[in-house]
Amino acid sequence: MTDLLNDRLPPQNIEAEQAVLGAIFLQPSALTLASEVLIPDDFYRMSHQKIYNAMLVLGDRGEPVDLVTVTSELANTDLLEEVGGISYLTDIANSVPTAANIEYYAKIVEEKSILRRLIRTATTIAQDGYTREDEVEDLLSEAEKTIMEVAQRKNTSAFQNIKDVLVQTYDNIEQLHNRKGDITGIPTGFTELDRMTAGFQRNDLIIVAARPSVGKTAFALNIAQNVATKTDESVAIFSLEMGAEQLVMRMLCAEGNINAQNLRTGNLTEEDWGKLTMAMGSLSNSGIYIDDTPGIRVSEIRAKCRRLKQESGLGMILIDYLQLIQGSGRSKDNRQQEVSEISRELKSIARELQVPVIALSQLSRGVEQRQDKRPMMSDIRESGSIEQDADIVAFLYRDDYYDKETENKNIIEIIIAKQRNGPVGTVSLAFVKEYNKFVNLERRFDDAGVPPGA
């Protein structure tokens, strides 16, 4: 395959490259347009790379960019003869009658450059497949990363005129005004939480943090179930701590109001079997997709969610939990930097796929040393930039976790410590431990299946 590639001329368009350089000679202000799109390496011909680089150097110094100054700059760096001398520069300067089409020519040069990068990347991936002895997962992750770098170069966005943004913003406001209710995002199913957040917004990274055994996994799973069973949105769940079967057992308990211990032991009554059948039917019709790969890389999460969105649609991503995700390995000697890199990538995934990403997080033991055990931002374990990247940071706190004699048994506080586009505050829910289920406080005794002492 390498021989086949070596026999073929890589994608390039010399005329377009000359047109870009000629347009800059003709109208130096065209350099600004070109520099927003092209870097020297985008030019196929080496001489064009050096000429364009000289133009950029002059532009950065605030000096005029014309035939005389570019010739002088190349001569001063002993590159004039390498690029073809003054005669070739003159030919380029005379090659285009107008600079009006520079953006069109620059786009051609950029696209040819992307194709060459893609070919080089694919060739490297193929060679690594034959020669490297790394774990297959490492090769896949690295291959995906390099392909993504090529794709991201293509997808860089330009400035948007505020007039265009205002039109889109007005349309969105009008849609919000015309819709019923105050929920503008994806409803969690918890009334007071939805009232405070207006639902979880697309593009948002939501961090849910708590000490072990407080109920953060149950809380997140309840949200996932509510979304998947009560809306037409699909939910991707990445469980790095528990297997898929354990998660499904928990979801069956919550969906069917089945005692968790009875389900674990198989000690089910006839009524329980009926509830189980109902719960299985409800969950099987929901769009819940579970990946229980331990130690999954953030690049794998991105790739799998991309594929899922293309094939089945995607409305929400849930990750349990953030500190178990592997980063790229670039910051392997500094775990805090690696976790910061992961949180930035998760925010990037939320924006790219336009879905809320809920990432559970551990809290440090520092919270145990204070008299008031309610968590604070500084308690997020290996926090790094987590609190900066997150749009919402929610802490879970249960008084009976620390005080067994408290009157607030099975009441959990959802402390919204940060909300980028909304208020902060506290929402209280009831936790029905037997069912691994959270319910709105006003519903606490509504369901006959929920014991009064819950």
From Swiss-Prot:
Domain SF4 helicase positions: 179-445
Keywords: ATP-binding, Cytoplasm, DNA replication, DNA-binding, Helicase, Hydrolase, Isomerase, Nucleotide-binding, Primosome
Effect of loss of the gene: Essential, it cannot be deleted; in depletion experiments DNA replication stops as soon as the protein is degraded.
Gene Ontology, cellular component aspect: cytosol; nucleoid; primosome complex
Enzyme class: isomerase
Entry's EC annotation: 5.6.2.3
Localization terms from the record: Cytoplasm, Nucleoid
Keyword Transferase listed: no
Superkingdom of the source species: Bacteria
Gene Ontology BP, a term: DNA replication
Coiled coil, from the record: none
Pfam families, sorted: DnaB, DnaB_C
Effect of residue 350 to V: In ts199 (dnaC199); defective in inititation of chromosome replication
Effect of residue 69 to I: In dnaC30; defective in chromosome replication
Reaction(s) this enzyme catalyzes, per UniProt: Couples ATP hydrolysis with the unwinding of duplex DNA at the replication fork by translocating in the 5'-3' direction. This creates two antiparallel DNA single strands (ssDNA). The leading ssDNA polymer is the template for DNA polymerase III holoenzyme which synthesizes a continuous strand; ATP + H2O = ADP + phosphate + H(+)
UniProt GO MF annotations: ATP binding; ATP hydrolysis activity; DNA binding; DNA helicase activity
Subcellular location, principal: cytoplasm
InterPro entries (UniProt xref): AAA+_ATPase (IPR003593), DNA_heli_DnaB-like_N_sf (IPR036185), DNA_helicase_DnaB (IPR007692), DNA_helicase_DnaB-like_C (IPR007694), DNA_helicase_DnaB-like_N (IPR007693), DNA_helicase_N/primase_C (IPR016136), P-loop_NTPase (IPR027417)
Residues binding ATP: 210-217
Function: The main replicative DNA helicase, it participates in initiation and elongation during chromosome replication. Travels ahead of the DNA replisome, separating dsDNA into templates for DNA synthesis. The monomer has helicase activity in the presence of DnaI which is further increased by DnaB; the purified oligomeric form (probably a DnaC hexamer) does not have helicase activity in vitro, nor does the DnaC(6):DnaI(6) complex. The direction was not determined but is probably 5'-3'. Helicase activity requires an rNTP and is inactive with dNTPs.
Subunit structure, as described in the record: The DNA replisome assembles sequentially on oriC in this order; DnaA, DnaD, DnaB, DnaI-DnaC helicase. Monomer in the absence of ATP, in its presence forms a probable homohexamer which is not active as a helicase in vitro. Interacts separately and simultaneously with helicase loaders DnaB and DnaI. Interaction with DnaB does not require ATP. Interaction with DnaI requires ATP, probably forms a DnaC(6):DnaI(6) complex, which is not active as a helicase.
Family indicated by similarity: Belongs to the helicase family. DnaB subfamily.
Name used for this protein in its record: Replicative DNA helicase DnaC
Source species of the chain: Bacillus subtilis (strain 168)
